[in-house]
Amino acid sequence: MTGGTIRERVVESAIAITVQDGWSSVTMARIAEAVGVSRQTVYNEIGSKPDLAQAVVLDELARVLAVVQSAFEAHPRDLRAGVRTAVRGVLEYGADDALVHAIVAGTHGADTDLLPLLTTSSEPLLEVAVEVVAARLAAYRPGSRDVRRVADLVVRVVLSHLMNPAASPARTASDLAWAVDRLLPT
């Protein structure tokens, strides 16, 4: 594996192993071999396996938030369309992404070590996502001071639908966009 910093290569390797064999197959020795460095170098770059898990999830979050940013940029004057496009994009991304499937599989009895980073220990992830969504919502200058609350609601609902979809991405996106439009009149 070549290209990128050692840290980036370590995270990419952990993702590849997780997708192929599950999180329980990820070891620092296996990553070191894939990256072409010593196991100690992996520990120096990342820390412990829980630190690596957080790095993997935050890397995936960055990809998801790029979808969110792009969706809002495509609709700079239409809050409802921006929310609808962002939510649909994230849900479709999650439905197609092998790492998201590997993480969410923990809800169905498979490897569960990554799942707490989306559920019971999700505060770091949620904080980052809520900040990005709140900033995007605030750009529409809604007539409400509850932008952060609404952003938190949106992030938590989308996360819930990533783990256990109740409807199609299009339907969920439309419903959530309708709700945001009511909660944040522009």
Regions found by a protein language model. Give the residues of each.
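Basic, helix-initiating cap at the start of DNA-binding domains
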Residues: 1-34, 50-54, 59-62
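Short amphipathic alpha-helix in the helical subdomain of ABC transporter nucleotide-binding domains
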Residues: 3, 147-155, 172-176
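Short, hydrophobic secondary-structure boundary micro-motifs
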Residues: 27, 99-105, 112, 116, ...
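Short hydrophobic/aromatic patch on the recognition helix
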Residues: 35-46
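Hydrophobic alpha-helical connector segments
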Residues: 51, 55, 68-96, 151
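Amphipathic alpha-helical packing segments from all-alpha helical-bundle domains
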Residues: 65-66, 102, 111-152
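Intrinsic, short, N-terminal disordered tails of RNA polymerase sigma-factor systems
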Residues: 88-92, 119, 130, 185
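Amphipathic C-terminal alpha-helical segment
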Residues: 92-96, 135-139, 152-171, 182-186
